[in-house]
Swiss-Prot record:
Keywords: Acyltransferase, Amino-acid biosynthesis, Cytoplasm, Methionine biosynthesis, Transferase. Belongs to the AB hydrolase superfamily. MetX family. Residues 45-356 form the AB hydrolase-1 domain. This is Homoserine O-succinyltransferase. Homodimer. The active site is at S151 (nucleophile), D317, H350. GO terms for molecular function: homoserine O-acetyltransferase activity; homoserine O-succinyltransferase activity. SUPFAM superfamilies: alpha/beta-Hydrolases. It is found in: Cytoplasm. It comes from Leptothrix cholodnii (strain ATCC 51168 / LMG 8142 / SP-6) (Leptothrix discophora (strain SP-6)). Transfers a succinyl group from succinyl-CoA to L-homoserine, forming succinyl-L-homoserine. The lineage of its organism: Bacteria, Pseudomonadati, Pseudomonadota, Betaproteobacteria, Burkholderiales.
Length: 377
């Protein structure tokens, strides 16, 4: 299948302060983004891709300096792929507070000239959506043909239909939920605590000390990675396989292949991800709850939505189970909204939304065909 080839990141800077849900404001900020495909004459074929916790604006294609830098959803987006860049103008944007180029904790605080660190304001899903809307304003795009996201990205897609209902034609919400369960909040808290209690964290101002709280980041990633996989997929990939033929009878050495894998994932993550960003994004996950202002009534919260919806879940995803997706579907049906639902039998757990499953991609391809057919001709 034809690929996008080399792509280039772009930037857009904003001097007008972005009001945040916390009551604070983000001033003089920059958003990094990428686009794929061509915006049509009436600017009606734009699709926004919202990223999850440790992803970025680099959704598809590769960079010229590294053919190994494939975008995180490259199997989905490109010429002839389910989200076909021959038909759609696709936008990926890095959210404020992240660590992949948009203004975040590693950037200078205009008030001090030093990195924000822990002083970066707390951001929410709603704040990200408002920042994305400003980016679209700058690109001259009044309305999206569709917005799509998986996991935390799905929460952003849902939020788009509530905060800017007139600007969204279709919303594709994949492997997501209307809010986090207590168990998910607990996982996030344990991961944050691992980072905060790392001696190299220095209350979030570790940049000035020339260190990185890698121990905490490693543990946080190991915890998170376990939740992204299903028991079946871990058993199939690792089982009880040992690293060597004989047991070492040690409490500290690596004995099992799954231990080695988790440590590898933790080591890799700690080399590129920012600790303060991890705290910010997991807290944004915790805070997302559109029904909160409606006494917990999700149907009432979604009444303002005008988009058409596709909701997708995966049978072995225990972090955001199919039950959570069905909550969204029911609330939309309560409001007589146009919603399609697909529950994909897949063994891969939460990470299934990132993989090239033929049934899953078949559903997305068919739905984007519908979106394309509704574009002005």
């Amino acid at each position: 299948m034809v690929t996008l080839g080399h792509v280039t990141a772009q930037q857009m800077s904003f001097s007008d302060a972005l009001p945040l849900r916390s009551g604070a404001a983000l001033r003089d900020y920059t958003l990094v983004y990428e686009t794929y495909g061509t915006l049509n004459a009436d600017r009606s074929n734009a699709v926004l891709v919202c990223h999850a916790l440790n992803a970025s604006h680099h959704v598809a294609g590769t960079y010229a300096d590294s053919d190994r830098s494939e975008g995180w959803w490259d199997n989905l987006i490109g010429p002839g792929k389910p989200l076909d860049t021959n038909r759609f103008f696709v936008i990926g944007v890095n959210n404020p507070g992240s660590c992949f180029g948009s203004t975040g904790p590693t950037h200078p605080n205009p008030a001090t000239g030093r990195p924000y660190g822990a002083d970066f304001p707390v951001v929410t899903v709603e704040d990200w959506v408002d920042a994305q809307a400003r980016l679209l304003d700058g690109l001259g795009i009044e309305r999206l043909a569709a917005v799509i996201g998986g996991s935390l990205g799905g929460m952003q897609a849902l939020s788009w239909t509530l905060r800017h209902p007139a600007r969204v034609g279709h919303a594709l919400i994949i492997a997501s939920a209307p809010n986090l369960s207590a168990q998910n909040i607990a996982f996030n808290e344990v991961a944050r605590r691992a980072i905060i209690t790392d001696p190299d964290f220095h209350a979030g101002h570790f940049y000035a000390h020339g260190v990185v709280p890698k121990r905490g980041l490693r543990v946080a990633r190991m915890i998170g990675h376990i939740t992204y996989l299903s028991d079946d997929s871990m058993e199939a990939k690792f089982g009880r396989a040992l690293r060597s033929a004989e047991l070492a009878y040690s409490t500290q050495e690596i004995e099992f292949q799954i231990e080695s894998y988790l440590r590898y994932q933790g080591d890799k993550f700690s080399e590129y991800f920012d600790a303060n960003t991890y705290l910010l994004i997991t807290r944004a996950l915790d805070y997302f709850d559109p029904a909160r202002e409606f006494g917990g009534n999700l149907s009432a919260a979604l009444a303002v939505a005008r988009a058409k919806f596709l909701v997708v879940s995966f049978t072995t995803d225990w972090r955001f189970s199919p039950l959570r997706s069905r909550e969204i579907v029911k609330a939309l049906l309560d409001n007589r909204r146009d919603v399609s639902y697909a529950e994909i039998a897949a063994p891969h757990g939460h990470d299934a939304f990132l993989l090239d499953d033929p049934r899953y991609h078949g559903v997305l391809r068919a739905y984007f065909e519908r979106v394309a057919q509704e574009l002005p001709r």
